[in-house]
């Protein structure tokens, strides 16, 4: 298999895997619709997912990486739909509007700033890539609290093994793809994603679940690589 064909195959499988990962939010929204309430859950993961995918979409357009563009068009659309569903069923609509307004402001400010660098395309790509990495790393910081809880309780039953394993595979695929196309902005966040997933998988070995269910795991605790 040629290098070009291998790159194409890897990017295609990575896109498919990532979209399936994004679709995990649909199960949560389904519960909102069934209960006609969001309960005490937060809409921040959906809103931040929209922000992350929007930035990566911008990066994909600037670098002409079609796989990045495709997966983040799908991702930003899904997270926007999830946010709208959350808004419909939450009692705290004002907070949701404020959070989404803040995210939109950040998005617009970054786009306007990078557009001013149009004559310096490499710098435009560099700045956008840094922003993408920062946003993604912030996602990866979210599960750390749950990891500390598992370590204190010495019980990993609150962690969903299938979702964590999927996250590892997705991050690994994008990491390899980033290496193949020599893109450090794709490599760095997905390397961190692999490490985080391995840490969580390691907790299953160190602290086996006493009665595994995984129901306590919330979307906020799952990082989104793209």
Swiss-Prot record:
It is a multi-pass membrane protein. The keyword Membrane applies. Its main location: Golgi. Pfam families: MtN3_slv. Residues 9-93, 128-210 form the MtN3/slv domain. InterPro entries: SWEET, SWEET_rpt. It comes from the Eukaryota. It is found in: Golgi apparatus membrane; Cell membrane. Keywords: Cell membrane, Golgi apparatus, Membrane, Repeat, Sugar transport, Transmembrane, Transmembrane helix, Transport. One of its GO terms (molecular function) is sugar transmembrane transporter activity. The chain crosses the membrane at residues 9-29, 43-63, 68-88, 95-115, 130-150, 161-181, 185-205. GO terms for cellular component: Golgi membrane; membrane; plasma membrane. GO terms for biological process: carbohydrate transport; salivary gland development. Mediates both low-affinity uptake and efflux of sugar across the membrane. Belongs to the SWEET sugar transporter family. This is Sugar transporter SWEET1. It comes from Drosophila melanogaster (Fruit fly). The lineage of its organism: Eukaryota, Metazoa, Ecdysozoa, Arthropoda, Hexapoda.
